[in-house]
Amino acid sequence: MRMNRMSRARARTALALAVAGLAAGATAGAGPAAAQPKAAPAPPADCSAAHRIEQKLANGTTWRMCWRHSGMAGIVLEDVSYQPPGEARPITVLNSAKLAQIHVPYDDGIEEYADLTDQYFGDGLLNLTPGECPGGTIRTVRVPDARHSDSTDVKGLCTTTRARGHAYHLQSLKPDMSLGKLYQKQGKDLLVYAVNKVAWYEYITEWRFQDDGTIHMNVGATGSLAPQSYDAGDGQGWPIGKGAKAKALSHSHNVFWRLNFGLDGSSKGRIEQYDSKVSPPAPGKPAPSNKTTRTKVTKELAGDAKNMRWWRVVSATGKNKDGHPRSYELVPGPTAKYPGRGFTKHDVYFTQYNKCEQYASGNPHCPDGHPTTVDKWVNGQTLTNPVVWVNIGFHHIARDEDQQPMPVHWQGFSIAPRDVTAMNPLTPKELAGTNGQLDEGG
């Protein structure tokens, strides 16, 4: 049975209808620009044309992927590959990427929701209007149990491109230190996004694919504050409206993503953790020193972010033209970690692949007796096929400006290429011969 998150609102139907009415009203031979033998056309992503996304961006980078819809997770991306200029074939990055939970505990300790697995997040897909997908294509998504559409065919997935500003800026210098040539390029991104409604909240699930190989994964919460929760106690809410009569109840949004990497076509990547430590100036040295240490993560891990700590997923098979193993680095965004539940206590989890482990909590696919939350899956298994779970939290203390509608507040993270290519994939051809050299070519 699918739960109804709006249970507290039933006693206030008139108010609900009034708010609903408002809602209606990124050596020369190693450089990316070096001449390459003409390659055969890259094969399309392994899915039907209707579920295939392929976009060549203005700077020459091509992204390819498949998509499908899940009643719980919403839009799921699969077989994601990246082909920058100068690479003869696509480089597989991800086998799959999806939301794995939106955990919403309220500060009063009474209400707590799992918006994916309890509320069937995917069934709340909304139709998009052309104005919401400027310059792009709105794709039709089959949603058998669509909650907010008269049809099971929901026009709910936008793919478009968008300028992001400077990809780089280099003012070169001549030997006499006067200004030489200016190298600058404007970046372009592929955006893939959908909007899902869960009770009063609406969530924009966005993937942003830069022309330099970076992928941003974000969720934007918008819609409306829950009007049945304007009765918060002291220390658990914020006054909105006239005076202090209406206090919106504070709550958290703990968003999880599940990433199954497939770098260079292999799921057998490895995980590495890096920590840097700053020490006081040593005798005879004028400044502090900083040393970075690598730790190989060979077994499952519940990881906590720290200053100067980061992780990367390293390809088991692929190397760039410099002979360095390809990898992607995890770049978390701002977070407010929620310690109230075991599975929300950590920032990232690395678990051994198990087909039934699909959601960070409330996982419905595993057999009886199997733990249902991601923290319980970290039990010492050796990592040969790691799955990455990222947790980004946001503590929402409302403000007057949150009504009405509520401005989008974003939370998310990125994965950035580290040694995927031998140089910046957007390097101009005049600088292609500077790999590992200091000469700016100016």
Predicted regions located by residue number:
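Extended effector regions of multi-domain proteins
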Residues: 39-206, 210-214, 224-233, 240-442
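Secretory targeting and sorting signals
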Residues: 1-37
